[in-house]
C-alpha cells in the first residue's frame, strides 16, 4: 500500500503561485499555517476569509510507482473525506469525481499509472458556486439565515 498523505502543493486555480499543502487537511488550514490568511477562529475574522469558498483550488503531488506495483492485477486509489466537489486526475487523465465528503471513494487506477514518477491532481470546485448553480435549477426551502442552496 502506498499512502499519499503528507506534503502536497496547492494553489488557488486562478493564481500562479503554489504553496505547501498537507493531506489530510484543508485549504483554510494550509493558508493559515503559511500566514496567508487571518485566523478565522479569532474574533470576527471569519468574515474576512468567507469569500475564499468562492474560489477553486488545486492540490498536486508526485509519487513513485515501482514495476512490481505496476504489475499488480489492480491498483486502487481510496479517498476518504474529500470535501466536497472535486475532480481527480492521474497523469493528466480524469479518474473520477467526488461529490460528497461523507463517503469513501474507490478508483481503479489500472491503465492510468506508469513506472516511475506519477502525478495526481485534485481540482476542488467552489462549494458556493456549486450550491448556487443547483439552487438556481431547483430551489429548496430551508433556513433563511444561511446560504441559499446549502442543502446541496
Regions found by a protein language model. Name each.
Residues 2-14, 27-34, 54-152:
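Accessory beta-strand-rich segments of carbohydrate-active enzymes
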